[in-house]
């Protein structure tokens, strides 16, 4: 129904929320196709939607724009602010009190914690080119 009358601007709120991965991909591809001749504004918490569709991103917090740029620009702005630390399960709680922690993955030698922030633990290995929009989200919103 949103496309009746061929509008030049589409406003979508969480267009892929609750969809299984296959349907999410289908909807994202459709939105990307529509964006060739329309302005599309969409609100989402699904970071992969942004990575696949957006050519410009506005991050809003309490109604204020806190960051803006292309996905690549936002990712590049995180250089030096994302690291990974290997620790034990017992150490996770303390690290979560001091740092913004992203994904926690099981590794052979313990747990790998993604750490995001202006200051990283000394033992953190900076991830370099392995930064994504999820890191940007954690930096600004967690």
Question: Which residues make up each language-model segment?
Answer:
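Conserved catalytic motifs of ABC-family nucleotide-binding domains
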Residues: 6
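Residue-level recognition of hydrophobic positions within alpha-helical transmembrane segments
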Residues: 19, 45-47, 130-131
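ABC transporter nucleotide-binding domain
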Residues: 29-115
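C-terminal coupling/interaction segments
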Residues: 103-142
């Amino acid at each position: 129904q949103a496309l009746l009358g061929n509008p030049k601007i589409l406003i979508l709120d969480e267009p892929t929320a609750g969809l299984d991965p296959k349907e999410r991909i289908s909807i994202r591809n459709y939105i990307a196709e529509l964006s060739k001749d329309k302005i599309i504004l969409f609100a989402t918490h699904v970071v992969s939607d942004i990575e696949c569709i957006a050519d410009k991103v506005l991050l809003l917090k309490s109604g204020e724009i806190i960051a803006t740029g292309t996905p690549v620009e936002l990712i590049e702005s995180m250089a030096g602010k994302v690291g990974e630390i290997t620790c034990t399960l017992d150490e996770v709680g303390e690290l979560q009190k001091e740092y913004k922690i992203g994904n926690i993955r099981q590794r052979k030698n313990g747990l790998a914690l993604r750490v995001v922030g202006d200051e990283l633990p000394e033992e953190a290995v900076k991830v370099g080119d392995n930064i994504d929009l999820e890191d940007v989200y954690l930096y600004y919103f967690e």
